[in-house]
Regions:
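A short alpha-helical cap/connector motif
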Residues: 1-124
Length: 124
């Protein structure tokens, strides 16, 4: 089980626990910064369940790592969890362009992106 415990909500929530356990055992552990962002999203936002979460985030990073695009467009940044994961997989010269229409979410997200290890790859 992940660090999120019973409160974890992700796209695979409806899948049987053995499958989630298998996936969790075979993917990279969740980065501490992403974990803190996920927690802050669920504590400080109304729609925290919309955050991508660990499993989805690792999938996004894997896809970008395999494809190696120079540019990625994300429409709907929300708290920035998926943006950080996408940016992790980009090549050194890669850029992620992400847009958020909700001003309150942008205010929440901007510091998280700015303080991240991949801030130089994200245009927000």
């Amino acid at each position: 089980m992940s660090r999120h415990g019973d409160a974890q909500v992700d796209a695979l929530q409806h899948v049987e626990d053995p499958i989630n356990d298998y996936i969790a055992q075979h993917i990279d552990p969740e980065d501490d910064y992403l974990y803190r962002l996920y927690r802050a999203t669920n504590i400080h936002t109304i729609h925290g369940r919309m955050a991508s979460g660990h499993i989805q985030g690792r999938l996004l990073k894997m896809l970008v790592t395999m494809i190696q695009p120079r540019n990625v467009l994300e429409v709907g940044t929300f708290s920035g969890y998926s943006a950080l994961c996408l940016a992790e997989g980009l090549p050194p010269e890669g850029k992620l362009y992400t847009f958020e229409i909700n001003d309150e979410m942008e205010d929440f997200t901007r510091p998280w992106i700015a303080q991240s290890a991949v801030a130089d790859k994200i245009v927000f």
